[in-house]
Amino acid sequence: MEVFASNWASRFGQLCLCAGLVLLPALTQAAESDPWEGFNRPVFTFNDTIDTYALKPLAQGYQAITPQFLEDGIHNVFNNVGDVGNLANDLLQGKVEEAGIDTSRVLFNTTFGLLGFFDVGTKMGLQRNDEDFGQTLGVWGLNSGPYLVLPLLGPSTVRDASGKIPDSFLEPYSYINDVPARNVARVVDVVDTRASLLSAEKFISGDKYSFIRNAYLQMREFKVKDGEVEDDF
């Protein structure tokens, strides 16, 4: 379930919030990118069932009992940890300016922000970048390949799935020797991520599987091209 949160839950929220990027003319193209739908749909149902009966109730309970300032602070801490991966992929993509911004964010948030509890970087005008190795592979020219829904990991593509391995080495959990502390950190990350996305569900309409697929493919293209998506018109 730990991996489930950091991937499926976070991407679920991004998909909902980026739903406006999904243009009707692109739906057919998205469907053509899903030749493995017969496999993907059952896996999607499995993931969604876990979310409905396990992760979502935990997130709702967490949100109900956690003061907003504490919830925000915890979320900021995990974002600060994630900025290390953003920085690494900035460099791999040759984005020098973005790398400088993310370096500054990590330094200021870790020190003045008390290990990231306070997001002083954003208040200083240092906007957070969102990069991963799947995007890096896209920038390097590797095609996304077919759409793929991974058990517990959620929506992906062949390219993005292969990018998860390098990304995993940038996560802090494998470097925490104390097993109970490591497990607690993972669980809190899972629940906090899902709780921050509860309000995003209202954006879903129609067939949930198709909505998530189409939004995911559009979102990833948008991110790989840094918003410079070609217009079909």
Q: What annotation goes with each model-predicted range?
A:
Residues 53-69, 134:
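Membrane interface segments of multi-pass transport proteins and intramembrane proteases
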Residues 32-46:
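Short N-terminal segments immediately surrounding and downstream of signal-peptide cleavage
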Residues 13-24:
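Bacterial N-terminal signal peptides
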Residues 24-31:
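Sec/Tat signal peptide C-region and signal peptidase I cleavage site
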Residues 80-155:
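Mid-length scaffold segments of soluble, non-membrane domains
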Residues 31-33, 48-59, 82:
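Short alpha-helical hairpin
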Residues 1-9:
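N-terminal secretory signal peptides that target proteins for export/translocation
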Residues 31, 135, 140-233:
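A structured, mid-to-C-terminal "fold-capping" secondary-structure block
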